């Protein structure tokens, strides 16, 4: 093939690419690649949305305008698991109460979603993909695109990809990228300082537990969720060898034997538990601190390093696996290595994020220590 022929072939290829892009734009559709490397074609102007998880990330991109674009969502995730967030959003936007419930997890109502005729369905890959593997043909037949994001991976790269993806889908790529940049800057406050630690600086031992009240031992985390974050923040998780499940049980005797340097409870409102630590929207600092102190009375805990040194704290459970979870990571890092993060104020940074990007006001208490 001559140089001239090759040049002409290249020009033809470029022309076809430009024509293809122009056709897609003129036809009112775009193609995105989701976090599962699936190419998905959807309308340029999305007006009707169904979402099953990570509502805050959607609203961070759309603002209040996103409420009117919702035609269906999973009520059980919000109303059933995160009562404080549910109350906050439905108080600010009562119309959310009238939007269709499309089910949750393995009980997603595919027929109900199809009947709503959304322009796009937004789903969490780790939460919804296994169920959806047998349902794609129904959505394809109805011409309804499904896009997957992933905030469960707890990596900077996947958070960024997911946030930028939502921005593209909702027609505001610039905002999605801006939020991703903000997140990266906040996370690097932790990553850079932990990376600068001397190898012989030591890793304090950490125990984390889902607060269920002092009389009941909640689950802990091994290699996932909070367990993974302990390592990222320069700590040693005493439950690291207990398996790879989402959460794991630990014997009370093992906690005492491990004698952790730091104990952190994750907390959220639960209607079925009256004496747990309550943090999040609308939470009260003094009530949360009193509940936190009640854990000091557990049998054998008076001998633990964490209790003797006042290293007992609490954090809102959903300051993980969200685009605002940088505040949770910063708080965790500050508890583990206070000397490295003395100038970092996680709740102030969280408040700044909400003021910039969220369509509801930040109130309540999201982290708590004994010293405040």
Indicate residue ranges for each PLM-predicted region.
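Bacterial N-terminal signal peptides that target proteins for export
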Residues: 1-11
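Bacterial Sec-exported substrate-binding components of ABC uptake systems
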Residues: 6, 19-59, 174-209, 341-372
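Hydrophobic core
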Residues: 12-20
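Short helix-initiation/N-cap motifs at beta->coil->alpha
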Residues: 35-37, 96-109, 243-252
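A short, structured surface patch at a secondary-structure boundary
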Residues: 57-115, 120, 124-127
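Extracytoplasmic ligand-binding site segments that recognize negatively charged/polar headgroups
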Residues: 75-83, 125-134, 149-163, 198-228
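Structured C-terminal subdomain patch of bacterial secreted/periplasmic proteins
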Residues: 100-101, 154-168, 177, 181, ...
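Alpha-helical, coiled-coil/dimerization segments enriched in small aliphatic residues
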Residues: 219-246
């Amino acid at each position: 093939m001559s140089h001239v022929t090759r040049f002409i072939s290249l020009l033809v290829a470029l022309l076809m690419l430009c024509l293809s892009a122009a056709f897609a734009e003129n036809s009112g559709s775009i193609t995105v690649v989701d976090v599962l490397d699936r190419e998905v074609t959807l309308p340029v102007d999305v007006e009707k949305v169904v979402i099953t998880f990570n509502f805050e990330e959607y609203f961070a991109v759309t603002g209040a305008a996103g409420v009117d674009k919702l035609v269906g969502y999973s009520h059980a995730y919000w109303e059933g698991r995160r009562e404080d967030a549910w109350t906050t959003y439905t108080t600010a936007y009562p119309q959310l109460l009238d939007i269709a419930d499309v089910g949750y997890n393995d009980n997603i109502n595919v027929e109900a979603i199809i009947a709503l005729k959304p322009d796009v369905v937004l789903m969490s890959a780790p939460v919804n993909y296994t169920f959806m593997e047998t349902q794609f043909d129904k959505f394809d037949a109805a011409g309804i695109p499904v896009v997957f994001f992933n905030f469960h991976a707890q990596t900077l790269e996947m958070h960024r990809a997911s946030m930028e993806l939502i921005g593209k889908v909702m027609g505001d790529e610039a905002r999605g990228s801006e939020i991703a940049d903000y997140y990266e800057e906040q996370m690097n406050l932790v990553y850079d300082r932990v990376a600068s630690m001397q190898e012989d600086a030591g890793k304090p031992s950490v125990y984390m537990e889902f607060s269920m009240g002092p009389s009941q031992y909640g689950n802990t985390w091994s290699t996932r969720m909070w367990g993974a974050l302990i390592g990222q923040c320069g700590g040693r998780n005493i439950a690291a060898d207990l398996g790879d499940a989402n959460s794991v049980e630990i014997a009370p005797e093992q906690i005492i034997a491990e004698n952790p340097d730091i104990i952190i409870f994750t907390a959220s409102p639960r209607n079925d538990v009256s004496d747990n630590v309550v943090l999040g929207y609308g939470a009260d600092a003094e009530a949360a601190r009193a509940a936190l102190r009640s854990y000091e009375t557990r049998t054998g805990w008076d001998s633990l390093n964490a209790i003797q040194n006042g290293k007992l704290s609490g954090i809102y459970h959903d300051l993980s696996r969200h685009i605002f979870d940088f505040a949770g990571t910063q708080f965790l890092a500050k508890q583990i290595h206070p000397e490295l993060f003395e100038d970092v104020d996680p709740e102030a940074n969280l408040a700044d994020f909400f003021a910039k990007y969220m369509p509801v006001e930040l109130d309540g208490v999201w982290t708590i220590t004994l010293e405040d």
